[in-house]
A protein has these predicted regions:
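Conserved class I S-adenosyl-L-methionine
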Residues: 1-32
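Acceptor/aglycone-binding surface of glycosyltransferases and processive sugar-polymer synthases
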Residues: 142-144, 149, 156-157, 313-329, ...
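Conserved beta-strand signature within the Rossmann-like core of class I S-adenosyl-L-methionine
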Residues: 129-137
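A conserved acidic beta->alpha catalytic loop
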Residues: 287-295, 342
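Class I SAM-dependent methyltransferase SAM/SAH-binding core
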Residues: 46-93
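A short glycine-rich, Lys/Arg-flanked "PGG" loop and its adjoining helix->strand segment in the class I
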Residues: 116-128
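Hydrophobic helical membrane-anchoring modules
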Residues: 207-252, 267-270, 274, 397, ...
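Conserved donor nucleotide-binding strand/loop of the catalytic core
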Residues: 281-282, 295-329
Length: 529
């Protein structure tokens, strides 16, 4: 099986590197891997995927790459990968120590008659709270189905033969019987290996929709199988600071609008201080007329952590109004705006800080980048988001992928001088689009998105109610831009503060370095009315 998998990757040079990188990124985003956490890769072969894992994880994690085939082992050992050890394994139970790994990953490992036995061996290898992520052939993919039914077809395609149909519910039952919890079996990877190189970007752009569309998703070539061993994962994770850029120490105001978030605030603040304590100038919790104990919980936290500040808003409520008040109160050099339920993806924030440390004006956490990962994202929300951004691309900014997410790290003056007109969720589109239209140098950074779990409470975002406001906000911005000028980007040399591309209608707003900061410095009323 290991040799067949190796031959498969080498057979499709136009798509295999992309698929291998996607899988490495999925490991990183699903687990939110912290530096120092240990990874076991099963069936590493010559190390083709190991190279991508090492690169995506920055060489910060000890990787044990288990090779089954002796010939491939000699090829693997010639690779000099940082923090990686190749080992020959013939017996999972005997050759690897128990409870040694935070994560176990692999491709086409369970797809044979002994996968129940192997699940038991893998359970033994994981630490309490450890997780497993495997990529297996999707039995209901037409090519895989034909390959199993018509053996000559399987030999002609050259794929590794799947000895047992990976029936989703059967697998979930066996995994549960072995003791695993949080079992996810999800169709994955709509990109066919024979896709012409010229069509790959198009397939990438539509993959988010196709991989989440009912029925269509069942045609994906792969399943990702995500399991967890019971145990308190959070307490065993390393206590490590991700704040490595000294120039950003004490620089950032974290602005968090909250509505009925008493279940999440304490965990969020604790995690922010643990991961990014050196960056924190202040954490501003904007209580947007909550009916639970959000304000009380925040006051209790602020009594112990002086950098936590509470803004207790009065009606009317709305995300846009909460953001406006939070930005006005912020005193840091940078403002990071986020939702309270982003606690699981905090390790990914380091990529945003890297962007501003490089000298850019800001960064946006993009859920729909080619390297993003979505987990249990509602299909209708994907369709609405993609329709909105298609209009943005056609009518305003061709290059954007996801500017409406409320995860943004900007220079503080950009947000303080930004005029937010939408009182509710559509303000997130304004905070993404208006600075870009004004010419600021802002980069989209791939992140993951995980749907709320039961312990995180319910979201107040209701797509049917907020979608029309997003499109109205877009129409308002299009009208303002078209009234201001007909061409969107002109190169203006020597305008570092404003970014590279500066629109004619925005120049007045950008020429403000020596002026007092005013809420109307960008997108003045006469531009939009």
């Amino acid at each position: 099986m290991e040799q067949s998998r190796e031959a498969y990757w080498l057979r499709y040079p136009s798509t295999s590197p992309l698929k291998l990188r996607w899988r490495a990124l999925t490991v990183r985003h699903c687990f939110h891997v912290l530096p120092g956490e240990s990874i076991l890769e099963l069936g590493a072969g010559s190390g083709l995927w190991t190279e991508h894992l090492t690169g995506v994880l920055r060489g910060e994690n000890p990787i044990t790459a288990a090779v089954f085939n002796e010939d491939l082992m000699s090829a693997a050992t010639r690779k000099k990968l940082p923090n990686t050890r190749f080992v020959r394994v013939t017996d999972l139970a005997a050759d690897l120590p128990a409870a040694s790994f935070d994560y176990v990953v692999g491709t086409v490992i369970l797809c044979h008659d002994r996968y129940a036995e192997n699940l038991a061996a893998l359970y033994r290898l994981l630490k309490p709270g450890g997780q497993l992520l495997f990529f297996e052939a999707n039995y209901w993919n037409p090519q895989v189905l034909l390959k199993n039914i018509i053996r000559p077809f399987g030999r002609w395609t050259g794929d590794a033969r799947c000895h047992v149909g990976m029936r989703k519910f059967k697998l979930m039952k066996i995994a549960s019987h072995q003791g695993f919890t949080h079992i996810e079996v999800i169709p994955y990877d709509i990109l066919h290996p024979l896709t012409p190189r010229a069509l790959v970007p198009f397939v990438q752009s539509t993959a988010f929709i196709l991989e989440h569309a009912p029925l269509v998703r069942e045609l994906c070539g792969t399943l990702y199988i995500w399991l967890q061993k019971p145990g308190d994962r959070e307490t065993r994770r390393p206590s490590i600071s991700l704040a490595t850029r000294r120039e950003l120490f004490g620089s950032t105001s974290f602005v968090v609008p909250c509505h009925n978030e008493e279940m999440n605030i304490a965990r969020l603040v604790e995690a922010l201080v643990g991961f990014y304590g050196e960056y924190i100038h202040e954490i501003i919790i904007v209580n947007d007329n909550s009916t639970d104990r959000t304000a009380e919980v925040t006051r209790d936290i602020a009594a112990r952590e002086p950098r936590v500040k509470l803004i207790d808003r009065q009606p009317p409520n709305g995300v846009g109004l909460a953001l406006r008040d939070g930005y006005a109160a912020a005193t840091g050099r940078y403002i990071l705006t986020m939702d309270c339920d982003f606690v699981h993806i905090l390790p990914e924030f380091r990529d945003l800080f890297e962007v501003v440390a490089e000298g850019r004006d800001g960064a946006i956490g993009s859920r729909f980048s080619h390297e993003s990962v979505l987990i249990n994202y509602p299909f209708f929300k994907i369709v609405c988001n993609r329709a909105f951004h298609l209009l943005v691309k056609l009518l305003l900014l061709p290059g954007v992928r996801d500017v409406s997410n409320n995860l943004k790290l900007y220079r503080a003056d950009i947000l303080k001088n930004l005029r937010i007109e939408e009182p509710h969720f559509a303000a997130n589109a304004e905070t993404g689009l208006k600075p870009l239209l004004a010419g600021y140098d802002i980069k989209e950074v791939p992140i993951s998105w995980i749907n709320r779990t039961v312990e995180m409470g319910s979201s107040s975002f209701k797509i049917a109610g907020v979608a029309p406001r997003y499109f109205l906000a877009l129409l308002r911005m299009i009208w303002g831009a078209w009234r201001g000028h007909r061409g969107f980007s002109q190169q203006v040399s020597g305008t570092k503060t404003a970014g590279r591309a500066v629109d004619a209608f925005a120049r007045e707003a950008l020429d403000k370095s020596d002026q007092p900061k005013s809420p109307a410095a960008i997108w003045r009323k006469d531009t939009l009315s």
